[in-house]
Every structure is written in C-alpha cells, then in structure tokens.
Design a protein with these regions (language model features):
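Hydrophobic Val/Ile/Leu positions in short beta-strands of Rossmann-like dinucleotide-binding domains
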Residues: 5-6, 59, 132
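N-terminal Rossmann-like NAD(P) cofactor-binding module of classical short-chain dehydrogenase/reductase
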Residues: 57-58, 83
Length: 276
C-alpha cells in the first residue's frame, strides 16, 4: 500500500492520517471545512487533488454525512477500494451495496471521550479492534487491501454482519452514552455544581465521562440505530424496575454478585481497557 485518501479531517480522520504517515504512507485528505484542511495540512496531510491512483479511500465523517456522501457519489474516481469508519453500519452498508467501487463498512473500536480536543493522538488506532462488514460490492481484492491497511495499524480484523453490528453496538456504546447523559441530567437539575464536585469521585467521573462526546455524534447514532436503541432502552428500564422490586437484602446481594462475577470474568478474559 502506497497511498490513502481520507475524506473528512476531523479528530478520527486526521489521527488516522497521521498514524499512516508515520508508517510511510502518502496520505491525501479533504474536508468541507477550510479550517480542518489547513490544520491537517500543517500536520503533514496533503490536501491537494491528485490524479494518482489511490489504494484506499476512507470516509471519516459523521454517519449522516457518510450516508449523504454515498447517495451523491456512487462512483468515486481513481480509487481501488472504499472504507468508512462510521459508528453504525446498516444504512451505510445498504448504500455501499450499490457502489461501483468495491466497498467495505468499517468501525474502529477506538476514540476519545472528549472528541472536541484537537491534540494529535494517532496512537488511538494502534492495536484497536476494527469491525468490518462485507457488502454486495466487496471484492476479494478490496478485502486484501483492507487487511494490508489494518496490518499497518497493528489492528485486529473482525468481520461481522451489519445487522448484528448495530444491535451489539447499541448495548456497548449507544445505550451507555444515553445513560451517562441521564445521570448528568439528574445531577445538574437537582444539585449545585459545587456540591456535586465536592462529593464526586471515580464512580461519577467514570459513569459520566461519555457526556463529553460531541452531541452531533449522538444524534447520528440515534438517527441510524433508533430501532436497536429503543429496544434495549426498554430492556434497561425493565432491569431497573426489577432492581426496584427487590425486597430482601439477600436478593440485592445475589443480583449484584451476579453482575460482579460476569464483569470480572470479562476483565480476566480481555483485560482492563484504559479510560480515554
């Protein structure tokens, strides 16, 4: 792999470009924002147009913008393969099915909770799990290109069906974001900030750090995955209702112990992940 084009030079796109540059890859980039283009250019991403054939074009925009881009650009010039890194996959992959370019849906399991920070952090992609969804336009050559791309990142390649991806990601990412916001809602509506911060420690900080996420990303995930989010919010409310119905101390201990055992088993198998 010699060169990559990244469309969308926000936090994720720029950091991906910087990671690839550090591996000796020529990175071209473009964004609708002049500010983003200028920032990326100063960091070493080439924002000039090129007629050179591109090995891989990556769509690194918010989900709804990726969807709009795919609707308007069924054919993308001088590229061998197309990949997106959006947080939901069903709608994106449905559009990629119709693409004239061999296309694969992607979702790197990395990022920063505070995605309004512009400090370069290209290392977030290193050794990340990279979820991939095949589409009707996917070719064997495009799979090889993606595999080589992920080797550059030292990332783990995991293939998953688009429907299954969106179902699971609603539990592991989308619902936690909404619960985090709900907890902040309780705190800010009922208590003074000095009272909250004077008594807050790891529990509150850990449970609410996701509220630092750009609201546009949250709206995108809800717009494109509302069916799964609503389904599991109902499951979550049922779980809360069951906790409220526990009458005996032993019942609550048993409930909490079951959760502790499951979470510890998860940590033992996969290790603890650093908070970002």
């Amino acid at each position: 792999m010699k060169n990559v084009r990244i469309i969308g030079l926000g936090l994720m796109g720029t950091n991906l470009g910087l990671n690839l540059i550090s591996k000796g890859i020529k990175v071209y980039g473009e964004d609708v924002s002049d500010y983003a283009n200028n920032r990326a250019s100063k960091l070493g991403i080439d924002i000039n147009k090129t007629d050179e054939e591109i090995d891989l074009t990556i769509l690194a925009m918010p989900v709804n913008k990726i969807i709009s881009y795919l609707k308007e650009n069924k054919k993308i010039s001088n590229t061998k393969a197309l990949l997106d890194i959006g947080g939901t996959k069903q709608e994106i992959c449905d559009l990629m099915d119709q693409s004239e370019i061999p296309s694969i849906g992607g979702h790197p399991m990395c990022g920063l909770a505070d995605n309004n920070s512009w400090e370069p952090t290209p290392e977030i992609y290193e050794k990340a799990t990279f979820l991939l969804c095949e589409t009707e336009s996917t070719s064997e050559d495009s799979k090889t290109i993606i595999s080589n791309f992920l080797k550059l990142l030292n990332a783990e390649e995991v293939w998953i069906e688009r429907e299954r991806h969106d179902e699971i990601i609603s539990i592991t990412s989308h619902i936690p974001h909404l619960i985090s916001s709900a907890l902040v809602g309780i705190a800010k509506d009922d208590y003074q900030i000095n009272e909250i911060m004077g008594m807050a420690a790891g529990g509150f900080d850990g449970a609410t750090r996701l509220t630092r996420t750009n609201p546009e990303m949250i709206i995108d995930m809800y717009d494109t995955n509302s069916k799964n989010i609503n389904k599991f919010l109902k499951v979550f409310l049922k779980e809360i209702s069951e906790i409220m119905d526990l009458q005996e101390r032993k019942e609550l201990i048993d409930y909490l112990s079951s959760s502790v055992e499951w979470r510890r088993a998860l940590s033992e198998k996969f290790g603890e992940r650093p908070l970002s």
